[in-house]
């Protein structure tokens, strides 16, 4: 399971497993704030095909093809498009894409930080941890879940403190 904004982290993380059909690849996009129509999840929300930065891809856009504003607690996932590689993986069914809201990511951040005993994840992989937390109870106890914790929370400390009501 990997977070997906533009998609480079997931592409690198999945590289070793992409040819193994028995391994499910799950990409988690930024669903934005709960109750808001703004998000950064073009794959999950069936955004139309468009061109962004010279590449054809799913893009969050208006009826005229103009890029729309996105919103996410995670600056690293706050992006209106996604790599053409992920568009291909979605279309072929090789990867499954979902999203986690800002609130789900923050809850996952707190749970992982409290219980795992390693450096707290940044807000990007907290979206992936949110998906792992959602699906784990539905899986066999023999199932192995691997989550890419691709950054630590030091870079997000101001956002996290603000959202949790702490002063820095």
PLM region descriptions:
Residues 3-14, 35-37, 126-132, 154-157:
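Short glycine/serine/threonine-rich phosphate/pyrophosphate-binding segments
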Residues 18-24, 137-141:
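Secondary-structure transition/capping motifs at alpha-helix termini
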Residues 1-9, 25-28, 143-149:
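A short, small-residue-rich loop immediately preceding and capping a beta-strand
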Residues 22, 27-116, 162-168:
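Active-site/ligand-binding loops adjacent to catalytic centers
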Residues 147-168:
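Glycine/aspartate-rich loop-and-adjacent alpha/beta segment that forms the canonical ThDP
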Residues 113-148:
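C-terminal structured "cap/appendage" subdomains that terminate the fold
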Residues 30-33, 125, 150:
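Short, ordered loop/turn segments at secondary-structure junctions
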Residues 1-3, 98, 121-124:
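Glycine- and other small-residue-rich loops at beta-strand/loop junctions that grip anionic moieties
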